[in-house]
């Protein structure tokens, strides 16, 4: 009799333990923003939901600016951004009675890519700037035979567009004939199909297109070593075009948003950063 009661008790405890472990957090979380961070946010959402099956997470891109606007308007819980939030966006948030909370969550290197057939071996930051501002229009000006340069970049809603303009172009305007595309994937695809093209994409996309585009080492200037965007070079910021990737919330996060960001910064969440192809923040 006692053995039967003990067995039933143990069974009940086992059920309670399994229920407690499987419960996790619940609710619906909306994440929106950076196209660069889209595969990363999807990876985090997938891994988080495995641990918290009662949580529903919606992840969409559209661009960093789109995500931050959605956060300000209250239509998303977390905005992903490949650039720091701008003062005017903080002011807009304050007008809605909150201050955005910033979370650096990963590190990225913006890879400069060309068609695999292009014989160019490397570029300086100045040369990249001159290409994208229109001072250099033909590959022959750089000593190689690849014809007319077709500059490809993102659209104005993109955080990468703005970061590249500020960090590489030093605030100068993009060349008028640049092909502006709505996604990083579209840039990589275009460069892979056009022998004269050059583009800029997040390192995770460069890795996924490894056999279709050629990643160029970049140097800080003439006479300085050209650095390939390896994980170590990006982490140490030796690679010239490195940056942090961010998540933003409406003030200090609570509930499901806090649980998600705690997961993002955990060893498991940072392992997801490496899995996707970016560089862990810690």
Language model features: what each stretch is:
Residues 1-9:
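Bacterial N-terminal signal peptides that target proteins for export
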Residues 9-17:
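Bacterial N-terminal signal peptides
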Residues 18-282:
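Exported/periplasmic ABC-transporter solute-binding proteins
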């Amino acid at each position: 009799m006692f053995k039967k009661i003990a067995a039933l008790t143990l069974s009940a405890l086992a059920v309670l333990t399994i229920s407690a472990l499987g419960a996790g957090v619940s609710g619906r979380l909306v994440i929106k923003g950076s196209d660069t961070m889209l595969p990363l946010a999807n990876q985090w959402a997938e891994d988080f939901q495995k641990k918290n099956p009662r949580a529903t997470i919606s992840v969409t891109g559209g661009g960093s600016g789109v995500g931050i606007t959605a956060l300000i308007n209250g239509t998303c819980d977390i905005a992903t951004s490949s650039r720091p939030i701008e003062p005017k966006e903080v002011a807009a948030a304050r007008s809605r009675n909150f201050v955005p909370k910033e979370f650096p969550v990963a590190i990225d290197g913006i890879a400069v890519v060309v068609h695999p057939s292009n014989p160019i071996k490397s570029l300086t930051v100045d040369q990249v700037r001159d290409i994208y501002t229109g001072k250099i229009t033909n590959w022959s000006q750089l000593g190689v035979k690849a014809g007319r340069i077709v500059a490809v970049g993102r659209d104005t809603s993109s955080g990468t567009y703005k970061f590249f303009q500020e960090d590489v172009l030093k605030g100068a305007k993009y060349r008028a004939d640049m092909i502006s595309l709505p996604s990083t994937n579209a840039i990589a695809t275009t460069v892979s199909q056009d022998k004269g093209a050059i583009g800029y994409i997040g390192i995770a996309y460069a890795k996924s297109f490894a056999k279709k585009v050629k990643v160029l080492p970049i140097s800080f200037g003439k006479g300085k070593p050209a650095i390939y965007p390896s994980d170590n070079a990006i982490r140490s910021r030796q690679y010239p075009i490195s940056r942090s990737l961010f998540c933003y919330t409406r003030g200090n996060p609570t509930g499901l948003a806090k649980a998600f960001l705690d997961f993002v910064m955990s060893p498991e969440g940072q392992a997801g950063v490496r899995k996707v192809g970016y560089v862990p923040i810690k």
